[in-house]
From Swiss-Prot:
Subunit composition and interactions: Homodimer. Probably interacts with PlsY.
Keywords: Cytoplasm, Lipid biosynthesis, Lipid metabolism, Phospholipid biosynthesis, Phospholipid metabolism, Transferase
PANTHER family per UniProt: FATTY ACID/PHOSPHOLIPID SYNTHESIS PROTEIN PLSX, PHOSPHATE ACYLTRANSFERASE
GO terms for MF: phosphate:acyl-[acyl carrier protein] acyltransferase activity
Pfam families recorded: FA_synthesis (PF02504)
Family per record: Belongs to the PlsX family.
GO term, biological process aspect, one: fatty acid biosynthetic process
Compartment(s) where it occurs, according to its Swiss-Prot or TrEMBL record: Cytoplasm
Enzyme class: transferase
UniProt xrefs under InterPro entries: FA_synthesis, Phospholipid_synth_PlsX-like
Protein name: Phosphate acyltransferase
HAMAP family reported for this sequence: PlsX
Length: 351
């Protein structure tokens, strides 16, 4: 896959700014990245937009006559609307006509569609959404999972999240020896609720996971950890809070910049620094979160995503494809399962 152009199915009808901003981001990706884009949605609306702009050669339109609204119950909507844009996009991956799906639409519907149409990877009990956060160390990020796929989790789910996050950190983020932390209320192994205590024991005992201990909330962006695992309830709160902090910081900086001629001159001098700051803390720069654990590359973007965020989401999908994240997770699970089977057979024969 790394040697050919990735084919990305984009849910053109999903999101607050669909379809125009979604299409704009997809067009940019088709021009700047080594990808072919399949725009899935109302063909008349998509063609109308493209007629006002030049139609790039690496874009194909796939008609979908239905849309799942944000206020619909996801599972029933997915089953009722088989021709919804997110379902059609997932079917393209299932049929090997696309390598990944990107959607800024109903996140619950995207997860339900992925599970029903693509299924889970062998050895994975629950999917997880992984989000990349900036840290105080320039050029270094941390991936946090789960940030919303599961409100309730079990220790073995978090153990699987840690494994998938480790693989992503190593092969996509380029961290040779990732450090995995468990989000908790204290550094000590005796801290936390029942889920945290039991998960700690599993992570500590798993030699395939480079677990270094508990991570407190203040540690998430410290750069001391490369992977943070938590349940989806806590992770989603953390994600939304981090997004809000970034927006507040940018707004405060805008308000505090001096006014007048001298202020304009100072702002001009600071412009490169301010641009880099925005790139580091703006969630749109990361594009979305990878849905780990399903048998296909799925990127779930923020509902408020505009063209830059969609571009980055497509780039995120491309990175996951080129670095064979799914294949590496599957290979590990198969190896682990075989080792467990061999161990069981050895014990049985000795008895």
């Amino acid at each position: 896959m790394a040697s050919s152009r990735a084919r990305i199915a984009v849910d053109a009808m999903g999101g607050d700014y669909a379809p125009d901003e979604i299409i704009a981001g997809a067009i940019r990706a088709s021009a700047e990245l080594e990808v072919d884009v399949l725009l899935v949605g109302d063909s008349h609306r998509i063609e109308s937009y493209l007629q006002q702009h030049h139609k790039p050669i690496n874009v194909e339109i796939i008609h979908a006559e239905e849309v799942i609204a944000m206020d619909e119950e996801p599972l029933s909507a997915i089953r009722r609307k088989s021709k919804a844009s997110i379902n059609v996009a997932m079917d393209l991956v299932k049929e090997k006509r696309a390598d990944a799906v990107v959607s800024a639409g109903h996140s619950g519907a995207a997860m339900a569609s992925a599970l029903l149409r693509l299924g889970r990877l062998k050895g994975i009990d629950r999917p997880a959404i992984g989000a990349v956060f900036p840290t105080i160390l320039a050029g270094k990020s941390v991936i946090v999972l789960d940030v919303g796929a599961n409100v309730d989790s079990r220790p073995k789910y978090l153990e699987q999240f840690a494994l998938m996050g480790t693989i992503y950190s190593k092969y996509v983020l380029g961290i040779e020896e990732p450090k995995v932390g468990l989000l908790n209320i204290g550094e000590e192994s005796s801290k936390g609720n029942d889920l945290a205590l039991r998960t700690y024991q599993l992570l500590e005992a798993n030699e395939s996971i480079p677990f270094v201990g508990n991570a407190e909330g203040r540690d998430v962006l410290s750069g001391h950890f490369d992977v943070i695992v938590c349940d989806g309830f806590v992770g989603n709160v953390l994600l939304k809070f981090a997004e809000a902090v970034g927006e507040v910081m940018l707004q405060i900086i805008r308000e505090e910049l001096p006014q007048g001629l001298r202020g304009q001159l100072g702002t001009a001098l600071l412009k490169p620094n301010l641009k880099r700051l925005k790139q580091r803390i703006d969630h749109a720069e990361h594009g979305g979160g990878l849905l780990f654990g399903v048998a296909g590359v799925c990127i779930i973007s923020h509902g408020s995503s505009q063209a830059p965020s969609i571009f980055n989401a497509i780039r995120l999908a491309q990175d996951a494809i080129n670095n064979q994240v799914l294949e590496r997770i599957q290979a590990y699970n198969e190896q682990h399962q075989q080792e467990s089977q061999n161990s069981t057979e050895t014990v049985t024969s000795e008895q």
